[in-house]
Amino acid sequence: MDKLISNAPGYEKEIRTFWENIQMSAEQFDYARPWIQAMKSHGYRVYILSNYAYWTYLHTQETLSFLQDVDGALFSFEVHQLKPEPEIYQTLCARFDLKPEECIFLDDCQENAEGAIAVGMEAICFTTYNEAMKLLKEHNVEF
């Protein structure tokens, strides 16, 4: 935070307010845990690939209870890589013994979905739960 403030001293109050309330930036939707649990009960493995910074992760993980339901997670701060660069998708696959051609990657950013496609994954740009369910069915994912 000090580095941010030193780069923008006129915004110190705003920077401090933002970081003190960072946990409010993460929201868990009601469908998240049941959706993950349904996928897993039908034999699908579920992983998280996130561009979260360490500080953000520490201050939002309590809000994101679905983290305990996934098979694994890879956060940018752990590997110093970011979506949509190919290395982070490759690291995800290597860490969890995944084959890109067997993965369907969901992300709310089209650029990140395109990054997944570039390494051989199928991808869905997430807009709504219902749209994602429809697109998953088009990829022959049923649960």
Residue ranges of model-derived segments:
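Asp-based, Mg2+/Mn2+-dependent phosphohydrolase catalytic module
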Residues: 53-54, 58-143
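Helix-loop "lid/cap" segments that line or gate small-molecule binding pockets
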Residues: 1-10
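Short, acidic loop-to-helix structural element flanking the phosphoryl-transfer center
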Residues: 9-47, 86
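Short acidic/histidine-centered micro-motifs embedded in hydrophobic/aromatic stretches
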Residues: 3, 18-22, 55
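Glycine-centered secondary-structure boundary/capping sites
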Residues: 5, 24, 31, 80-81, ...
